[in-house]
């Protein structure tokens, strides 16, 4: 999770 917490 690089920042897109909703994605992964």
Curated annotation (Swiss-Prot):
Q: Tell where it localizes.
A: Secreted
Swiss-Prot/TrEMBL keywords = Amidation, Neuropeptide, Secreted
Task: State its role.
Answer: This cephalomyotropic peptide stimulates contractile activity of cockroach protodeum (hindgut).
Q: Which GO terms describe its cellular component?
A: extracellular region
What is the organism of origin for this protein? Rhyparobia maderae (Madeira cockroach)
- Name-wise, this protein is Leucokinin-2
Q: Which residues carry this modification: Glycine amide?
A: 8
One GO biological process term is: neuropeptide signaling pathway
Respond yes or no to whether keyword Secreted is given for this record: yes
């Amino acid at each position: 999770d690089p920042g897109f917490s909703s994605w992964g």
